Design a protein with these regions (language model features):
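Conserved MFS/SLC helix-loop-helix module at the cytosolic interface between two early adjacent transmembrane helices
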Residues: 12-48
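Helix-loop-helix hairpin linking two adjacent transmembrane segments in secondary transporters
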Residues: 90-137
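Extracytoplasmic gate region of multi-pass secondary transporters
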Residues: 161-202, 206-212
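Cytoplasmic membrane-interface "Motif A"-like loop-to-helix N-cap segments
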Residues: 23-33, 220-233
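Cytoplasmic helix-loop-helix junction between adjacent transmembrane helices
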Residues: 56-94
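Helix-to-loop junctions at the C-terminal end of transmembrane segments
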Residues: 13-25, 212-223, 306
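C-terminal transmembrane helical hairpin of 12-TM major facilitator-type secondary transporters
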Residues: 225-270
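A late C-terminal transmembrane helix in Major Facilitator Superfamily
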Residues: 274-311
Length: 337
């Protein structure tokens, strides 16, 4: 439920956040979002009940949706027409990198001091980030030419493309989440200890921190994003479907991270192709509203498959199917273009 409290604002506020871009700057909105993340941490520090923890998660969720939308827009503004896929990959991979650092650092802080110190550290980090963005960030000069009067609403063709791009991103992320949720169970069924199984599955997340940027660089250099995407999806699907062959588990997890998850930046680059620059703030709000609505049910469907069959492999087959439909959705996006 606390996880849901964090994600709920994304469904409700993504579109209004897109509206907000008409009235204030990206810099101020990101600063406010980071401050909300810090405030959520403060509420968690002083929380003494479930309701207070839920409130902390909601406040953090508000900050998350604002920063997600406008960090994406800021990167798009700076790198549109340049090495956009690479830049988007670096942005996207910063999230699992932060999670990985938190998993290590926060556990150490909690063991050395108190569990509240993890929230203290995260809140301080967000405050420093807010200060840095507010004091240092400047909109690129070329963006000023078309963002001084950002427009609300999207023409029908841009709305269609934005929803399709969101579908591609949502299916891709949903497949990854299902893999993280049920991959270890497949390995445990094959004889691994739970701790070892979780460590092997996590290898994909570690290597994708580097493979995403490399894949984005290759896409920007050779200008073949669709070919690269389909090759990566094929590798990802193969690694998922072969996961029950647990003697190859390490290699399959590495393959999934190195190849299957590599095209994240390539997919996020679709956002700039779906909408005009002066409608980007609102359009990315639409993009993430659709993303949250589409991706949220996937873990529940995977859980239902597991509960119904008692076999952890079926959710993995579901994840592979989601990756297959990523390719289909991308093809429809190109057709609609």
């Amino acid at each position: 439920m606390l996880i849901g409290a964090f994600l709920l604002p994304g469904v409700v506020l993504a579109l209004p956040c897109g509206f907000a871009g008409r009235y204030t700057s990206d810099r101020l909105l990101v600063t406010v979002g980071l401050v909300c993340l810090a405030l959520g941490g403060v509420v968690a520090i002083i929380a003494t009940s479930f309701n207070m923890f839920a409130l902390a998660r909601i406040v953090c969720g508000i900050g998350f949706v604002v920063t997600t939308i406008y960090f994406t827009k800021m990167v798009a503004d700076w790198f549109d027409g340049k090495e956009l896929a690479t830049a988007m990959a670096v942005l996207v991979m910063s999230w699992p990198f932060g999670i990985a650092m938190g998993q290590v650092g926060h556990v150490w802080l909690a063991a050395l001091f108190d569990w509240r110190m993890a929230f203290v550290a995260a809140s301080i980090y967000c405050c420093l980030g807010a200060l840095g963005v507010f004091c240092v960030y400047r909109m690129p000069t070329h963006a000023n030419d078309h963002t001084h009067s950002p427009q609300l609403g999207l023409p029908s063709n841009e709305l269609t493309l934005t929803l399709l791009a969101s579908l591609v991103w949502a299916l891709f992320n949903a497949g990854y989440i299902v893999y993280l949720s049920f991959g270890a169970s497949v390995l445990v069924n094959g004889g691994y200890e739970p701790t070892g199984a979780a460590a092997i599955i996590s290898l994909a997340s570690w290597v994708m921190l580097f493979s995403g940027a490399i894949c984005g660089q290759i896409s920007d250099r050779f200008k073949k994003p669709d070919t690269i995407l389909y090759i990566c999806l094929a590798g990802g699907i193969a690694s998922l479907l072969l996961l029950p062959w647990t003697q190859f588990a390490v290699g399959l997890s590495l393959l999934f991270g190195l190849i299957g998850m590599a095209p994240a930046g390539v997919i996020m680059a679709l956002t700039t192709q779906a909408m005009a620059p002066h409608r980007r703030a609102f359009g990315i709000g639409v993009f993430f509203t659709s993303y949250f609505l589409i991706s949220t049910p996937a873990p529940g469907i995977a859980g239902w498959l597991f509960d119904t069959t008692g076999i952890a492999y079926w959710p993995i087959v579901f994840a592979a199917t989601l990756f297959l439909f990523v390719g289909v959705a991308n093809a429809v996006f190109r057709y609609a273009q």
